[in-house]
């Protein structure tokens, strides 16, 4: 399980000699420091408000910051060792935590891009409070209407008969 931390900040250029990149480097240092102290042990709790306060206090020019923290899990799709082609199979990805219950319009589940039948796709849960997973193209059109489901209370993501052509990022995992 990985935590993806996306931080946006606002700062006042007139009260600092630092460049935006230099302030960003300070912020990355604060984020790394926070996670070094507050994570890695059983039952650790990450407090966004405390992390935001540390970021805001890291330089007097920072006016405020916004943080988005997402859990991510990686899995490596199975390949035929002889041909190198991906193989159709089922996958269960266990987040070991609850996953956000499905919302009306905003997906609770998303993935990196991959190619299916020559179309660049990603995974999302279907709209309207659904736990059904779909493959969608870049414009949000449904390419495959049901590739599995997720269980919010157990943190399990189930992909059924999942088969891709390639992984768009060039990584070996999704």
What do these predicted ranges mean?
Residues 129, 138-174:
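Surface-exposed interaction regions enriched in Ser/Thr/Asp/Glu
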Residues 1-92:
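Acidic, low-complexity glycine/serine/threonine-rich segments
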Residues 6, 64-66, 118, 154, ...:
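Extracellular/lumenal ectodomain signal focusing on beta-strand-rich modules
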